[in-house]
Amino acid sequence: MDNQWFQLGYLISAGLFIFGLKMLGHPRTAPRGNQLGAMGMLMAVLTVLLETDLVTRPVLIIAGIALGAAIGSLLAIRVEMTGMPELVALFNGFGGAASALVALAEIYSAIESDTIPKGLELHVAWTAIGLSALVGWMTLTGSLVAFAKLKGGFMILGKWRRTPTWGPSWLNGVKGLIMLSSIVVIYLSVTTPDDFQMVWVLILLACLLGVVLVLPIGGADMPVVVSLLNSLSGIAAAFTGFIISNPCLLYTSPSPRD
């Protein structure tokens, strides 16, 4: 199939996303906006499947779609309207994790197949992968903490535990140190691109950063935090779109979605 048709598919999906987001701004048009967003996602998925020739593996594709649809439907049906902020926090985390997993798969594939790029391409690709991993895993753990705070607590060994709000002044220094360490690890991964251990170190730092960023914030401010995490999830997806050369992710990911 001609590449022009794939670009047209991405353009149509991006248009549906944009119009859907605009309609989400008013309660009367929000249901229609949600439908347009779903149609845009369907168009994007179909375009990717056709462009990458993944339709030759129908069992894997159908299984993934069925599993994702089942989990999403179950969560959306069971959660009351008052629990929507918690659900949005979870979806933000899942979106960030998806972007981070794609980055992880890309770097693993390049190392295993010995197709690591050279020169400027290496610096650009590995930096984008590192930033996608950093923002994605940070969004996941931060969203999980936000979910626990909105819910008020969680069950541990059959006992209800309240989510703590803990943030001494010295924790700000720890946040800065973790962020600086993450940047150093990304730099080291560029200088030693075949060292997969750097990836695990970056994942650990990013997960820890997400926790310490959200932990000091009280439950009353969680909607603001969820909105910020939503934006970070979009940024992680944009980095991923750059990594895999997917224009649809670049068009729509940075857009605010709530």
Annotated model-derived regions:
Residues 251-258:
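Conserved small/polar residues in nucleotide/adenosyl-binding loops
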Residues 17-29, 70-87, 143-160, 209-219:
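C-terminal ends of transmembrane helices
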Residues 2-14, 55-68, 129-137, 195-204:
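Structural signature of hydrophobic alpha-helical transmembrane segments
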Residues 1-58:
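N-terminal transmembrane signal-anchor/hairpin module of polytopic inner-membrane proteins
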Residues 48-62, 74-83, 102-117:
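Transmembrane alpha-helix boundary signature
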Residues 107-116, 233-250:
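Transmembrane helix-loop junctions at the membrane interface of multipass transporters and ion channels
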